[in-house]
Amino acid sequence: MNQTVYLYTDGACKGNPGAGGWGVLMRYGSHEKELFGGEAQTTNNRMELTAVIEGLKSLKRRCTVIICTDSQYVKNGMENWIHGWKRNGWKTASKQPVKNDDLWKELDALVGRHQVSWTWVKGHAGHAENERADDLANRGAAQFS
């Protein structure tokens, strides 16, 4: 597993809920690939999760993946909260159903196929790759707004 792939991901929503989009900038060495899409009625958090899911789904073989996201929701969910949710039957600490559990379950399964680490980047702060992911997410949302 010597291939390291960087996934720069972002989600966007025009209204929350409303038309939304997701974007992924994939980088492997000097190679880059852009992915984006959207939905007519969604939330910003669903689009943030979908961006990571779509990036991971596009990988053809097991590899080391560094996911760079501006979403504390996604990063904290995968690094801290998901273990408790799974133990509690997909309920939060306050016994409420986990929001977006369909996407969390899909993301959890995809992460298990790779060696994944998570990096948080400040959004809208001039981080070039995050800005590109944001542009892609907005392109995805524009298809539905």
From Swiss-Prot:
Q: What class of enzyme is it?
A: hydrolase
Q: How is the cofactor bound?
A: Binds 1 Mg(2+) ion per subunit. May bind a second metal ion at a regulatory site, or after substrate binding.
Q: Name one GO molecular function term.
A: RNA-DNA hybrid ribonuclease activity
Q: Where is the RNase H type-1 domain?
A: 1-142
Residues that coordinate or bind Mg(2+) 2: D10, D134
User: Which Enzyme Commission numbers does its entry carry?
Assistant: 3.1.26.4
Q: What is its main location?
A: cytoplasm
SUPFAM superfamilies given in the database record: Ribonuclease H-like
Q: Which cofactor does it need?
A: Mg(2+)
Query: Where does the chain bind Mg(2+) 1?
Result: D10, E48, D70
Please give the family membership noted in the entry: Belongs to the RNase H family.
Q: What does this protein do?
A: Endonuclease that specifically degrades the RNA of RNA-DNA hybrids.
Binding partners and assembly: Monomer.
Full protein name? Ribonuclease HI
**The encoding gene:** rnhA
